[in-house]
């Protein structure tokens, strides 16, 4: 406070000698010093200069942002006050200049200075002029001052001698913004951020005091404090480099305007508006509307364009991510061609690969380390005289194709010994004469179906004579054959063909390797004891049936519970044969209607006729029920089944029809010739079959001993049988047809039964023959 009073006394003493020209120069210098002092203090001298000279009306020292804002606004100000040129005289020598209060930051650009200063060399016109910088003036007062007009050079100011210039009140920041004119630096001001509340309110008293002290130091006068002047000079030097460009532009612009102005002052200083109350130095922030940034929502006022913040709820659009480029699959690599690392002297071509599982020791000194896979599977034949080099060995890590197998017809060397524990593949056929004598048969081979290339006995190589009988247990084979006889008789009760696989599974079992002999022994027992023949009706599916032999005289119509069904079957077979070996379903049902049999009506003896014809007879292979080709809607027809061809013949059926009609079979010439040809073919086939059976039985040693000895039915295992749903499990032997029992007792008495006569012999044999004749008389009346 003491420094401030001393500085004020020095200025009063300097006022007595100052003229108007001096005042003009001082005002210009003061404005430039204010611009310099607005920069933030860069050294301790600036801080010292601004510290003790603070105005008592300010609440806090100006910050760096406030000083920068004052500099920007001062540079953009278009001064409305003209200054006189050099040698101009002031009419009022006693004019007083009061700079007691500093201008506000926002009010400087629009403040028209109302005081003129003399040139540097002009004499002071008013000895009593005083310059008071003790109080800061508000910016609001400067903004409201009337405009002043000044004359050009060498013109006198028409100001009264006692004009007083008072800058005591300072303008408010809000008032300055509304009256601020646009200057040449508008573009620069638009890019400047709007100051915050702290930068809008400031006290420039410290800057003005520092500027006045700097001017006094440059032109020393009485009563100037040395310390304050030095501090101001230091502050001006520190910010000179920072504000050099702005000072040059502002000074040049002011000079041009001073030289071009020739105006007069329109009003005196006494006509100024009343000073307003000093505003607070922390006024509210002034929003400055700028252009919205790209991508922002409309109708939003942005206060700080550079320090831009997103409004609530607004998010930046996420950048679109480019999907990663699709990677092409790696190029398929061609497997390298397999090369044979062994240099063969002669071309070796194997037909099929052979994989050796165990080491094989060759007669030559060559030891195979492991599995050997031969390349090139094409018919390999060694030239005569070719031998393996004595010193050649297979590389230890060499392997060929894993799926290569040896040829089936490749002969092994005669002197090539095989390891005793080396197993042969199960599906590798061997020559019939190449089976070692001491070669054991694996236990699991007993349940497999034997190959025709294998001998019945594993010790077949023991004898050089292949036709000689081999030592075996005949009693065990005959015992298994007897079980098979009982099994076949029970299975034939349902008239369903018997499969060979069922016989192997249920009866033969572990004797699979000799099953042909067991089956042949069973056939011999059936023929000699029961007069029944085991007939294979299907060579592909291996289906067997039991039929009566010609010597038994028990044809298709035996005295059984199925006699009515078999009588109807004989009529149906006749209808089919007389219609060209096929009869449509409509034709057959028309013939049965004339006999009083209709589909859908249950018969007391025959049951359901439709099920009997289309299911039971078809399942028993008596009939074949199939669809007519290319029929729309579909139609079905009946044909003879496989069993019918073996249990009867076309000639027998034709004789039956002729006997019913009391006509000669030769009356139907076409049917008679066809039946005769079939009968001749059947006789030739039966003769060839009988010859083959006799040869096989001689080779197997089957004779009368096969039927000798006690016969027991208690050794059969009933749980192995596959019964029909109509079977009686309590009394299984009741299922055996009566014909079988009659044939058995006939053979026991060594005579033929005379009570079983079929339609083949004559119409007056038995009740069954009469039943068939009655059906035939009704069913074949339409036959011409």
From Swiss-Prot:
Low complexity: compositionally biased ranges: 47-65, 383-403, 447-461
One record GO biological process: negative regulation of epithelial cell proliferation
Subcellular location, record wording: Cytoplasm; Cell membrane; Nucleus
Start and end residues of each MAGE domain: 477-675
InterPro entries: MAGE (IPR037445), MAGE_WH1 (IPR041898), MAGE_WH2 (IPR041899), MHD_dom (IPR002190)
Keywords: Biological rhythms, Cell membrane, Cytoplasm, Membrane, Nucleus, Phosphoprotein, Repeat, Tumor antigen, Ubl conjugation pathway
Chief localization: cytoplasm
Pfam family, one: MAGE
PTM sites of type Phosphotyrosine: 97
Annotated Sequence repeat ranges: 302-307, 308-313, 314-319, 338-343, 344-349, 350-355, 356-361, 362-367, 368-373, 374-379, 380-385, 386-391, 392-397, 398-403, 404-409, 410-415, 416-421, 422-427, 428-433, 434-438, 439-444, 445-450
GO MF annotation: an example: identical protein binding
Compositional bias (Polar residues): 195-214, 232-246, 259-269, 306-320
Stored Gene3D superfamilies: MAGE homology domain, winged helix WH1 motif, MAGE homology domain, winged helix WH2 motif
Compositionally biased tracts (Pro residues): 404-418
Region (Disordered): 41-67, 195-339, 379-418, 441-471
One CC-aspect GO term: chromatin
Membrane topology, record value: Peripheral membrane protein
Region spans: 22 X 6 AA tandem repeats of W-[PQ]-X-P-X-X: 302-450
Quaternary organization: Interacts with DLX5, DLX7 and MSX2 and forms homomultimers. Interacts with UNC5A. Interacts with TRIM28 and PJA1. Interacts with NGFR/p75NTR and RORA.
Described purpose of this protein according to its UniProt entry: Involved in the apoptotic response after nerve growth factor (NGF) binding in neuronal cells. Inhibits cell cycle progression, and facilitates NGFR-mediated apoptosis. May act as a regulator of the function of DLX family members. May enhance ubiquitin ligase activity of RING-type zinc finger-containing E3 ubiquitin-protein ligases. Proposed to act through recruitment and/or stabilization of the Ubl-conjugating enzyme (E2) at the E3:substrate complex. Plays a role in the circadian rhythm regulation.
Protein name: Melanoma-associated antigen D1
Taxonomic source organism: Sus scrofa (Pig)
The encoding gene: MAGED1
